[in-house]
Design a protein with these regions (language model features):
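Active-site beta->alpha loop and helix N-cap motifs at the rims of alpha/beta catalytic domains
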Residues: 3, 56-188, 319-320, 328-438
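Extended, intrinsically disordered, low-complexity segments
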Residues: 2, 282-332, 356, 370-395, ...
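A structural motif
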Residues: 53-58, 106, 198, 262-263, ...
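Catalytic alpha/beta core domains of metabolic enzymes, predominantly
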Residues: 127-144, 149, 171-321, 401, ...
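Glycine-rich phosphate-binding active-site loops on the catalytic face of alpha/beta enzymes
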Residues: 57-60, 106-122, 259-275, 482, ...
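Short, acidic/polar
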Residues: 38-50, 94-99, 250-254, 337-345, ...
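N-terminal amphipathic alpha-helix/helix-capping segment at the start of soluble metabolic enzymes
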Residues: 1-32, 148-154, 290-339, 547
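Conserved, mostly hydrophobic/aromatic
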Residues: 30, 91, 160, 203, ...
Length: 618
């Protein structure tokens, strides 16, 4: 049972992968995946060793054919000769026979339910009678059980790895593109594992959409509990991208689950060198797990809240905050910031700027300001903020919107009476608890349970230097992920006791909102990290496409190394660029292929031309 308000690890069955354990009482493991050709032993070993030296505890390699699967023996032998015992994981798609071979040489084999025995997707609805559907499940069992027997004989672990982008037409036809369909795709395999008493199983459910990823994993946890299954989970956001956006997107999804105690191993998938993923994953794990043993947070879940299928908490709109409005962003001016000279990104200007005890002399046209209540004079576009101990003064100040800072544990009768009497008040939820998520959740559920519809802005305070900006971004994204996906967030206010620029804090807040699918402020790139299947220069291609499309706010562009997830993830993108073979690229509009096998040297130009022409038609 998940405790919304207090951090503790979910109890998962122990699984042995080579010399390390996943689940049970083992720490959360971090891993990455090579991008080299799996037939190139020297290149794979060199890259695997870089991953291991960075702190990676498992290394995954693509094994698209029998040759690649057999070469795992050579890669494994060379790593052992070099003194490394790190387990290798074979990544198998489209060919169940390859999984049989890989199980002989890898410590773990990942199979994808979407393409293990089901034919390649053509995105067509197929009508099955119940009897025909049962026959398909029998075919799956007949093929999967021999593989499990090989794994049992060789002490090889199995990962059932479902990707939102590669669901089979069979699952899509019966369940649609839904969390229920994704979960059922996994459960079909788990039921066979349980029937065969094969317990050396790890599960993953991934998507590039953080909301789908988190909600689907929550549903899977619920379904497994109902079936008395306790397999460990591997977490990741597929095609997260690169740079700050990729890190923030990963932290929103992975962090939301880790914060609820879910996850036994993680991978942060970045379109960068694989060893660059490890420090990011390690920081996320360390940041969340240090909450263990925190002071108990007393909280009661609101009766209308659903952890598995959350909807936005009902609130009354105050100005542009709450109701059906997108969440707002509030920025604080630092001691050395001049309100008139601070420059914000034009598409990421804060909705409100907090100025402390005095307003700037020359204010920006149309900009809204927040000022301490005892300095508030009622000037246009200015709003007062009250600390929780100034609740008695709220009624004496006239303003269309007022802000009240609250923390769980404040005298509830006093603040509830104030909020009931003053619906114009926006709550600013703060916490200095080690488990700030639990405390901020508990406060918001308390409001909800007592019929209070005041919007809630979550204020998060950090202490980082400018050199640690990436750490702040990961922590803020992890802290806000669950609050946003739970439907509790009406605004974000990031503050920092350090020299990180206010513009960087504001940009981070907007990036977190976009990663959680709550507010769009820039072009979004759904790009995979690449693997041995990728046959073009992924990183330079991403850079070219970004340079040409960064101004296209609101557009989602998929950049995928191969067809494993490519066409499926295109359903979540407006346009796509997908590897189609050596030196060849196919272009997509959503999941419809519009140009096939374009020479790589011409493909970016073709994509940009197609986007331009298509947008003109609209």
């Amino acid at each position: 049972m998940i405790d919304l308000f207090n951090y503790r690890r979910r109890e998962a069955s122990p699984v042995q992968v080579g010399d390390i354990q996943l689940g049970g009482d083992a720490p959360i493991r971090v891993q990455s995946m090579t991008t080299t050709n799996t037939n190139d032993t020297e290149a794979c070993v060199a890259q695997a060793e870089r991953i291991i030296k960075a702190g990676g505890e498992l290394v995954r390699l693509t094994t698209q054919g029998r040759r690649e699967a057999e070469n795992l023996q050579n890669i494994n032998a060379q790593l052992r000769a070099d003194g490394y015992t790190t387990p290798l994981v074979a990544d198998v798609h489209f060919n169940a026979n390859v999984a049989d071979v890989a199980a002989l040489y890898a410590e773990k084999v990942r199979v994808n339910p979407g393409n293990y025995v089901d034919p390649a997707r053509v995105f067509k609805k197929i009508e099955y009678t119940d009897a025909e559907y049962a026959d398909e499940l029998k075919k799956l069992e007949d093929r999967f059980v021999p593989f499990l027997n090989i794994c049992r004989e060789h002490h090889t672990a199995v990962r059932i790895g479902v990707n939102h982008g590669s669901l089979s037409d069979r699952i899509m036809s019966r369940y649609g593109d839904t969390p229920e369909g994704i979960v059922e795709s996994c459960m079909e395999f788990l039921r066979i594992c349980k029937k065969e008493q094969f317990d050396n199983v790890v599960i993953s459910i991934k998507a590039s959409n953080t909301v789908i990823m988190v909600r689907t994993v929550r549903l899977l946890i619920t379904e497994m509990d109902n079936a008395d299954m306790h397999y460990p989970l591997h977490l990741g956001v597929t095609e997260a991208g690169e740079g700050e956006d990729g890190r923030i997107k990963s932290a929103v999804g992975i962090g939301a689950l880790l914060a609820d105690g879910i996850g036994d191993t993680i991978r942060v998938s970045l379109s960068e060198e694989p060893e660059a993923e490890i420090p990011v994953a390690r920081h996320l794990v360390d940041y969340i797990t240090k909450r263990a043993g925190h002071t108990l947070v007393p909280g009661t879940e609101a009766k209308d809240f659903s952890w598995v299928r959350p909807e936005r908490r009902p609130t009354r709109a105050m100005g542009y905050i709450g109701g059906s409005n997108v969440p707002v962003v509030i920025a604080s001016l630092g001691q050395n910031d001049d309100a008139e000279s601070v420059e914000f990104n034009p598409d990421m200007t804060p909705d409100y700027i907090y100025c402390g005890g005095s307003l700037p002399k020359n204010r920006r046209d149309g900009q809204k300001y927040i000022v301490d209540f005892n300095a508030y004079t009622g000037e246009p576009n200015t709003y007062p903020i009250f600390p929780y101990n100034a609740t008695p003064f709220v009624g004496g100040v006239k303003a269309d919107v007022k802000f009240l800072v609250l923390q769980l544990g404040a005298p509830s009768e006093e603040y509830m009476a104030c909020l009931k009497a003053h619906p114009e008040v926006v709550v600013v939820a703060v916490s200095n608890q080690q488990n700030r998520l639990g405390e901020q959740r508990a406060l918001t559920h308390e409001l909800w349970s007592n019929g209070l519809f005041n919007p809630v802005v979550f204020a998060q305070m950090y202490s980082h230097t400018s050199a640690e900006k990436a750490d702040l971004q990961l922590e803020a994204a992890a802290d806000m992920g669950a609050l946003m996906i739970d439907g509790l967030c009406d605004g974000v206010w990031l503050m920092n006791n350090g020299d990180i620029a206010v513009r960087d804090l504001t940009d981070t807040a907007f990036a977190i909102l976009q990663a959680a699918r709550l507010r769009t402020s820039k072009t979004e790139y759904i790009s995979c990290p690449g693997c041995g299947r990728t046959l073009y220069d992924l990183r330079s291609t991403i850079a070219k496409i970004k340079a040409a499309t960064a101004h296209m706010k609101g557009l989602k562009i998929g950049i995928m190394g191969c067809i494993v997830n490519g066409p499926g993830e295109m359903a979540d993108a407006d346009y796509g660029y997908v590897g189609a073979g050596p030196g060849k690229i196919s272009l997509y509009k959503q999941k419809m292929c519009v140009e096939k096998a374009i020479p790589e040297s011409e493909a970016v130009e073709h994509l940009l031309r197609f986007i331009e022409e298509d947008r003109k038609e609209k």
